[in-house]
Protein backbone atom coordinates (compact mmCIF):
# COMPACT_ATOMS: atom_id res chain seq x y z
CA UNK A 1 0.00 0.00 0.00
CA UNK A 2 1.10 3.58 -0.47
CA UNK A 3 1.45 6.43 2.00
CA UNK A 4 -1.47 8.30 0.44
CA UNK A 5 -4.37 8.96 2.80
CA UNK A 6 -7.55 6.93 2.24
CA UNK A 7 -9.35 10.29 2.12
CA UNK A 8 -7.55 11.19 -1.13
CA UNK A 9 -8.45 9.78 -4.55
CA UNK A 10 -6.03 9.94 -7.48
CA UNK A 11 -7.81 11.92 -10.22
CA UNK A 12 -4.93 12.57 -12.61
CA UNK A 13 -1.23 12.78 -13.31
CA UNK A 14 1.23 15.19 -14.85
CA UNK A 15 3.10 13.89 -17.88
CA UNK A 16 5.73 16.62 -18.31
CA UNK A 17 5.77 19.88 -20.19
CA UNK A 18 3.72 21.00 -23.17
CA UNK A 19 5.46 23.62 -25.25
CA UNK A 20 8.07 26.03 -23.91
CA UNK A 21 5.97 28.41 -21.80
CA UNK A 22 5.42 26.34 -18.67
CA UNK A 23 2.27 24.47 -19.60
CA UNK A 24 2.00 20.87 -18.43
CA UNK A 25 0.56 17.73 -20.02
CA UNK A 26 -2.30 16.60 -17.82
CA UNK A 27 -3.85 13.12 -17.81
CA UNK A 28 -7.27 12.98 -16.19
CA UNK A 29 -8.61 9.81 -14.59
CA UNK A 30 -12.08 11.32 -14.04
CA UNK A 31 -15.09 9.74 -15.76
CA UNK A 32 -15.65 13.11 -17.45
CA UNK A 33 -12.04 14.04 -18.10
CA UNK A 34 -12.44 17.82 -18.06
CA UNK A 35 -14.01 17.71 -14.58
CA UNK A 36 -10.53 17.37 -13.07
CA UNK A 37 -10.32 21.16 -13.21
CA UNK A 38 -13.38 21.41 -10.91
CA UNK A 39 -11.40 19.78 -8.08
CA UNK A 40 -8.51 22.25 -8.23
CA UNK A 41 -6.48 22.88 -6.17
CA UNK A 42 -5.35 19.28 -6.30
CA UNK A 43 -2.93 17.69 -3.87
CA UNK A 44 0.28 15.73 -4.28
CA UNK A 45 0.78 12.28 -2.78
CA UNK A 46 1.99 13.89 0.46
CA UNK A 47 -1.46 15.45 0.93
CA UNK A 48 0.18 18.86 1.44
CA UNK A 49 1.58 20.09 -1.88
CA UNK A 50 -1.12 22.04 -3.73
CA UNK A 51 -1.45 22.26 -7.51
CA UNK A 52 -3.87 24.95 -8.65
CA UNK A 53 -4.50 24.25 -12.31
CA UNK A 54 -6.50 25.54 -15.25
CA UNK A 55 -6.98 23.55 -18.45
CA UNK A 56 -5.96 25.59 -21.49
CA UNK A 57 -6.93 23.12 -24.25
CA UNK A 58 -7.41 19.48 -25.15
CA UNK A 59 -4.37 17.72 -26.64
CA UNK A 60 -3.69 14.15 -27.73
CA UNK A 61 -3.82 11.93 -24.66
CA UNK A 62 -5.15 14.57 -22.27
CA UNK A 63 -5.00 18.30 -21.72
CA UNK A 64 -2.56 21.16 -21.72
CA UNK A 65 -2.87 23.05 -18.44
CA UNK A 66 -1.33 25.88 -16.48
CA UNK A 67 -0.33 25.43 -12.86
CA UNK A 68 0.10 28.43 -10.59
CA UNK A 69 3.81 29.31 -10.13
CA UNK A 70 4.95 27.03 -12.99
CA UNK A 71 6.28 29.40 -15.63
CA UNK A 72 9.04 27.57 -17.51
CA UNK A 73 9.41 24.37 -19.50
CA UNK A 74 11.98 23.17 -16.97
CA UNK A 75 9.58 23.67 -14.05
CA UNK A 76 6.87 21.80 -15.97
CA UNK A 77 9.26 18.96 -16.86
CA UNK A 78 10.22 18.61 -13.19
CA UNK A 79 6.59 17.71 -12.41
CA UNK A 80 6.53 14.72 -14.78
CA UNK A 81 5.07 11.70 -12.99
CA UNK A 82 3.38 13.66 -10.20
CA UNK A 83 0.05 12.09 -9.31
CA UNK A 84 -2.79 14.48 -8.46
CA UNK A 85 -5.30 13.77 -5.70
CA UNK A 86 -8.64 15.23 -4.65
CA UNK A 87 -10.25 14.82 -1.24
CA UNK A 88 -12.87 12.06 -1.36
CA UNK A 89 -15.55 14.40 0.05
CA UNK A 90 -15.20 16.71 -2.97
CA UNK A 91 -15.88 13.91 -5.46
CA UNK A 92 -19.33 12.73 -6.53
CA UNK A 93 -20.99 9.79 -4.80
CA UNK A 94 -20.93 6.64 -6.91
CA UNK A 95 -23.77 4.22 -7.67
CA UNK A 96 -23.69 0.90 -5.79
CA UNK A 97 -22.01 -0.93 -8.68
CA UNK A 98 -19.18 1.59 -9.22
CA UNK A 99 -16.01 2.00 -7.17
CA UNK A 100 -13.03 4.27 -6.92
CA UNK A 101 -9.88 2.34 -7.84
CA UNK A 102 -8.36 3.30 -4.48
CA UNK A 103 -11.15 1.40 -2.70
CA UNK A 104 -10.39 -1.83 -4.60
CA UNK A 105 -6.63 -1.89 -4.05
CA UNK A 106 -5.71 -4.19 -1.19
CA UNK A 107 -8.95 -6.19 -1.19
CA UNK A 108 -8.67 -9.98 -1.00
CA UNK A 109 -10.17 -11.87 -3.93
CA UNK A 110 -11.90 -15.23 -3.40
CA UNK A 111 -13.46 -17.57 -5.94
CA UNK A 112 -17.11 -18.60 -5.61
CA UNK A 113 -16.00 -21.65 -3.59
CA UNK A 114 -14.25 -19.52 -0.97
CA UNK A 115 -10.66 -20.17 -2.09
CA UNK A 116 -8.34 -17.18 -1.79
CA UNK A 117 -7.10 -16.24 -5.26
CA UNK A 118 -4.98 -13.22 -4.34
CA UNK A 119 -5.08 -9.56 -3.42
CA UNK A 120 -5.76 -6.55 -5.67
CA UNK A 121 -2.43 -4.82 -6.30
CA UNK A 122 -3.66 -2.29 -8.88
CA UNK A 123 -6.46 -1.53 -11.32
CA UNK A 124 -5.36 -1.30 -14.95
CA UNK A 125 -7.15 -0.15 -18.07
CA UNK A 126 -5.72 -0.79 -21.51
CA UNK A 127 -8.66 0.61 -23.45
CA UNK A 128 -11.50 -1.80 -22.76
CA UNK A 129 -12.83 -2.80 -19.33
CA UNK A 130 -10.86 -2.28 -16.14
CA UNK A 131 -8.63 -5.17 -15.07
CA UNK A 132 -7.85 -6.10 -11.48
CA UNK A 133 -4.14 -6.86 -11.11
CA UNK A 134 -3.89 -9.68 -8.58
CA UNK A 135 -0.87 -11.01 -6.73
CA UNK A 136 -0.42 -13.30 -3.80
CA UNK A 137 0.73 -16.67 -2.52
CA UNK A 138 0.34 -19.45 -5.02
CA UNK A 139 0.50 -17.08 -8.00
CA UNK A 140 3.71 -17.44 -9.97
CA UNK A 141 2.96 -14.23 -11.87
CA UNK A 142 0.58 -11.31 -11.66
CA UNK A 143 -2.91 -12.22 -12.89
CA UNK A 144 -5.23 -9.77 -14.66
CA UNK A 145 -8.89 -10.38 -13.84
CA UNK A 146 -11.52 -8.56 -15.95
CA UNK A 147 -13.51 -6.22 -13.71
CA UNK A 148 -16.90 -7.07 -15.18
CA UNK A 149 -20.14 -8.10 -13.47
CA UNK A 150 -19.72 -11.63 -14.89
CA UNK A 151 -16.16 -12.11 -13.60
CA UNK A 152 -16.61 -10.11 -10.38
CA UNK A 153 -20.20 -10.57 -9.17
CA UNK A 154 -19.56 -9.24 -5.64
CA UNK A 155 -17.47 -6.43 -4.17
CA UNK A 156 -17.90 -6.18 -0.40
CA UNK A 157 -16.00 -3.13 0.82
CA UNK A 158 -17.22 -3.55 4.41
CA UNK A 159 -15.68 -7.05 4.55
CA UNK A 160 -12.64 -6.07 2.47
CA UNK A 161 -13.17 -8.75 -0.14
CA UNK A 162 -14.19 -9.50 -3.69
CA UNK A 163 -15.92 -12.67 -4.88
CA UNK A 164 -14.80 -13.61 -8.38
CA UNK A 165 -15.95 -16.09 -10.99
CA UNK A 166 -12.92 -15.89 -13.29
CA UNK A 167 -13.18 -16.79 -16.96
CA UNK A 168 -11.66 -20.16 -17.89
CA UNK A 169 -7.89 -20.03 -18.24
CA UNK A 170 -7.28 -16.98 -16.04
CA UNK A 171 -6.05 -19.10 -13.09
Swiss-Prot record:
Transmembrane segments: none annotated. It is found in: Cytoplasm. It comes from the Bacteria. Residues 96-170 form the PRC barrel domain. One of its GO terms (molecular function) is ribosome binding. GO terms for biological process: ribosomal small subunit biogenesis; rRNA processing. Keywords: Chaperone, Cytoplasm, Ribosome biogenesis, rRNA processing. It holds the Pfam family PRC_RimM. One of its GO terms (cellular component) is cytoplasm. Belongs to the RimM family. HAMAP family: Ribosome_mat_RimM. An accessory protein needed during the final step in the assembly of 30S ribosomal subunit, possibly for assembly of the head region. Essential for efficient processing of 16S rRNA. May be needed both before and after RbfA during the maturation of 16S rRNA. It has affinity for free ribosomal 30S subunits but not for 70S ribosomes. The PRC barrel domain binds ribosomal protein uS19. NCBIfam families: 16S_RimM. Binds ribosomal protein uS19. This is Ribosome maturation factor RimM. It comes from Ruegeria sp. (strain TM1040).
